[in-house]
Amino acid sequence: MKRGALLVPFVPLALACVDPGDSNHSCASVFSVSSAAAASFCATFTVSAVTETTGVPAALLSNCDYKTKHLSSACSCLGPATAAAPTQTSAVTPTVAPTTLKANAVAPTTEAPAPTKSSTFAGNGGTTCTVTEYAAISSAVASCSNILLSDVYAPPSSTIDLQNLQTGAAVIFAGTTTFGDTPDDDFDPIVISGTDVTITGADGHVIDGNGAAYWDGKGSNGGSSKPDHFIVAKHMYYSRIENLNIQNWPVHCFDIEHTENLIISGITLDNSAGDAPNSASGSKPAAHNSDGFDIKSSTNLTLQNSWVHNQDDCVAVSSGTDIVVDNMYCYGGHGLSIGSIGGKSDNTVDGVTFSNSQVINSSNGCRIKSNSGTTGEVSNIRYENITVSGITDYGIDIQQDYLNGGPTGKPTNGVKIENITFVDVTGTMSDGKDYYILCGDGSCSNFVFENVGITGGSGDSCNYPTDTCLEA
């Protein structure tokens, strides 16, 4: 949706209804931003017939706290003057690739205006601010409970800094968010912190990481300087990141650390443009080390209902406790991973479940990796209902000889790996080995395999539980 072009006008009825923002800070704002979807929805979703949320556009449903009373109030308060016939819209379906995302950078003006404020669409009793220029972000963060970032261009060396959000604040990305070139390994384009905050996207938005400006086939292993982490989510508590469309990040996409009770849902990560070689990468894919979600030192985290096309780990948990990764679609990368573990400030992973997910055309399916010559602990890990296909290296891979430059072939036993369960893990290989387990002396224990069947590889290689791999 273009700035300033509301497809369907909204008529506030402030005296005749209940403000939907009383209990949920972003509900009213998203009805304003996603006006076309709201118009179609409200045409049939009436106050007198609010019985279910089937068919509700994903952005409206999530920003209205999944409560029909908020949806009803929003339709009453912000009801469209006219409405098109309703259409069915579902949440992100990981098994279907998204349409191609496109980005057009918007050049910054010499002087940025202050954010436009509106009390009509205020959430949580606060103010909604629409930001169209980078320079207005800091004042919006300081003064607004709801922030709409519309077609924002971040100049070189300029972070979209969302670290000081008000408690309960909501940030909505709209239009196309773009970034200038910043060849700096320590530069983070987006940083988010806060308590009870919601980070979400309006219908049709794109966050473009300008990856093509940096890709050289080496990622963080050398070559030119490039931002190592695109989005840093740290010290987020009881918060949500949802319904974001992100493409073309330089190296690692999400760096998630020191969070508690964080829900990440409905994310589309499309780095498919990095599959092709360029002049700097030779015959290799231009993008490298392009992890989707790196999770560290976090507790009670849920990552769900998301789609990833990249060139490295789809998800990598290197430390943390009580983490659920559910309903993921992973294409082209290195699979669903624990690790690498060892040699870091936090080397403990306990209580991680990967479930109901697909790993397609990737080098690995399910992987646990510990760094050679280091210490740590990996325990209570469960892979359940995982389907793999087109895997080129290992269907199930547990190895204790890992190094970023390549495995040593000689496992060490400083990292303990115990209570590991695989249930209903099935699929096919296009090359490589179905199962590869290389444990250090006495460092692996209590592995369980139930209804595990991966076929098509050139054989297996295991030294635990036995040399016949899955037999205890």
From Swiss-Prot:
Known EC number: 3.2.1.15
Positions glycosylated per UniProt: 24, 300, 361, 385, 419
Reactions that this protein is recorded to catalyse: (1,4-alpha-D-galacturonosyl)n+m + H2O = (1,4-alpha-D-galacturonosyl)n + (1,4-alpha-D-galacturonosyl)m
Role of this protein: Involved in maceration and soft-rotting of plant tissue. Hydrolyzes the 1,4-alpha glycosidic bonds of de-esterified pectate in the smooth region of the plant cell wall.
Family statement drawn from the similarity comment of this UniProt entry: Belongs to the glycosyl hydrolase 28 family.
PANTHER family tied to this protein: ENDOPOLYGALACTURONASE D-RELATED, POLYGALACTURONASE
Protein name, entry field: Probable endopolygalacturonase D
Organism per entry: Neosartorya fischeri (strain ATCC 1020 / DSM 3700 / CBS 544.65 / FGSC A1164 / JCM 1740 / NRRL 181 / WB 181)
